[in-house]
Amino acid sequence: MEPRQKGALRGHKNPITCTIVFKDHKRNCNTLVTSDNEGWVAWWDISTKRPLGVWRAHSNSILSVVQIDHNLLLTHGKDSCVRIWAITQYEGFSKTFPAENHTESGSHRWPEYVEIPVNTLNFCNVCYLNGKLITPATQDSNNFDIYSIFPASAAHFPDIESRLSLRRIVANADPLALHKKAKSKENLTMGIDFEISDENSKRDGFGIMMKVVFVSPTLFYIGYESGHIIGFSLTEYKPNVNVKSKEGTTKAFDASFINKEPTLEIIYISAFHCPHPITALFFHDKLYAGSAGKTLSIHTKQSSIAEEPEIESYNLKIAGVQDIAVLPELAIVAFWNGVVKGYEKQSTEAESDQRELTTDFSTEPNTISQFKPAWKMSRDVPRIGTLESNNGQKEAQELPSKVKANTLCILKSSAITHSSYRDLVRARQVSPRLLTVGYADGVTIMYEI
């Protein structure tokens, strides 16, 4: 069934760059956070379609927005900083957007926040999970750093400045060097005692980071400019060890005394999308990847680089994947040309029938098809076409172009507690599942799916 529009969130005067679900634990409901390329952030009540708070989080475009705790929101901007905001005390927020071309934010109250300086020389996002933050490296945009920012021991502190304990646990990790190390280890396992030339060493590594996604506290994937997708395993040793003395007392010693630093290892690498830069990554049981090309790939997790990659590939017939969202029964892809398409996942029993029926979503040779085109949608840019000039001569009418869909986000409604009767009624009217699409004209539209 084609998505049905349920509402629009208007106010941003610039292209939307991020849309994420923010779980409001105070009211026990899901809300939405949007950002734009002028640094403005809006926190939305879905039932009323009105902002709970609006503020300018950065002086430049926002690249990443992530909820990292019950009341903390992380934003990452092109102004070379990551900021962490305590946003649940929203009663004092401004709830109005600035006028068009107005960037002064003095009248908009800022939430309490702390700041972390990071490298933003490229357009890669940052990624957070369980107290760890991955960012492009300070020294080299081709490499990456990993920070520990919220240790478990500080969880009881009342304010974010007290809880923040910034520690860089991995510095300037070089994927090319790690790949050579992994290949050498594999060669030794196979009994090969000489170095095999690496095609990646003939060029400037893998290029800059494009996308990064955490899968678990010990596993993450990075997509590169070269088109490679690399899976990294992170092993972090416990910071303290307990030693029992002869008298029976126990003392704790810092593990740094025995040089137990976190270790990184490459356990997966795919050159499937080369030479097209990776533009979208999404993990849902498997890793879904899109690039500047026309192909969607699905990668199965593996535990060693020695294993043969299991990749399913699909010809989307449209070049340039902007974003990907995946549900158990549906995959949604946004393209650079403004089209958003949905693909239903099919059971294996229906594969032969699907190959006969599918004309718009074919697979590459030797792959297994699991999808069927379900719907596609787009928004036209409003235009006034001139059919005749003043001298009466007919002129060619310009075809309308599409509004680019920048972001995709799946939002599931949840019950509101400790709220007014009016809010409870409004919450019942919200669809159980919404697809939110952030567009380049600053509008975020919600579709029932």
Curated annotation (Swiss-Prot):
Q: Where are the WD repeats?
A: 11-54, 57-95, 113-157, 224-263, 273-309, 313-350, 420-449
Describe its function: Component of the ASTRA complex involved in chromatin remodeling.
- Per the similarity annotation, which family is this? Belongs to the WD repeat ASA1 family.
- What does the record note on quaternary structure? Component of the ASTRA chromatin remodeling machinery complex.
Write out the GO cellular component annotations: nucleus
One biological process term from GO is: chromatin organization
Where in or outside the cell is it found?
Nucleus
Cross-referenced InterPro entries: WD40/YVTN_repeat-like_dom_sf, WD40_repeat_dom_sf, WD40_rpt
- Its name, as the record gives it, is ASTRA-associated protein 1
What does the UniProt keyword field contain?
Chromatin regulator, Nucleus, Repeat, WD repeat
